[in-house]
Amino acid sequence: MMASKDFLDKLVQTCPDGIIGIDRKGTVIIFNAAAEKLTGLAGKDVIGKLSIQDVYPDPEIAREVKKQIYSKEHGAPGSVEGLEVTVKGPEGRKIPIRLSAALIFEDEVEVGSVGFFHDLTDRKELEEELRRRSITDSLTNLYNRRHFHTTLMEAMARFARYKRPLSMAVFDLDNFKPFNDTYGHQEGDNILRLVTECTRSVFRQTDHTFRLGGDEFAVLLVETDLAKAGQVMERFKAHFTEEWSLKMEYLGRTLRPVTMSIGVAQLAVGEKADKFQLRADLAMYEAKSAGGNRVVLASKKIGE
């Protein structure tokens, strides 16, 4: 059997998690193959030459890790378990890891510490993908109704704090069901995707567009008053009509024209979210009742 030191060296080097050992001064003295892969650094360039602080993207992280090791928050004093931090990866990327570390003592004297670095990149990417799917409409890749309510409350909180105007537009496609019945759901889906393309051409990155369901959509226009929001939605409506015509011309097809009815409301001071949305909805219904293919600005109060 191989000598115990050789066995321990093999054990350290073959461990799938990064292992970094430091002396009492903070200089790296152990840097296994997994740590090399994680950070993009070669052990020969690290051991005896770099400090543990050089492994983290921010010195504050190293200080926080040291603080946690000496506290009881993540384990017994002298150790830390499951602390999620980031380390510097190849090309300066920040790599999320789960850190477990412990102080090393000889004759009750602290001589260094060892840390185990478990790469969380795959898990974090999966979590982000699941989060994205939970707030996104699968057909259009716009935000869904669930995220609409969350985003609306956040936007209203900013409005209450900064007093900058916030407007909402709600719109749907005129006679969408007859269109679907005539040409099939695939053609209907193509229209919904075209709506998405047009939103990206007209609205700012700071605005938020949602598919609420079916052919109903909503847009939150930040720092935009009612008059300006109305102008933006008129431009959006015209752009959609133009893109639809160009698409039909390109495909050499003649389908029933598609238009939209749009209602726009501006948030009033002290107004609740449900009333804000209701005013936009009522304005949209008014546009539809008047024949569709138009933008209607909501009254400040319901019934006015």
Language-model segments: residues:
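Short regulatory alpha-helical coupling segments
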Residues: 131-132, 145-165, 196-204, 222
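PAS-family sensory domains
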Residues: 109-119
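A short pre-motif secondary-structure segment
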Residues: 208-211
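Sensory-domain boundary capping and coupling elements
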Residues: 99-101, 117
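PAS-family sensory/regulatory domains
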Residues: 45-60
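Terminal output helix/cap of sensory domains in signal transduction proteins
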Residues: 57-93, 232
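Conserved nucleotide-binding and Mg2+-coordinating catalytic segments in signaling enzymes
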Residues: 131-150, 171-184, 193
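Catalytic-core segments of nucleotide cyclases and related cyclic-nucleotide turnover enzymes
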Residues: 226, 230, 234, 253, ...
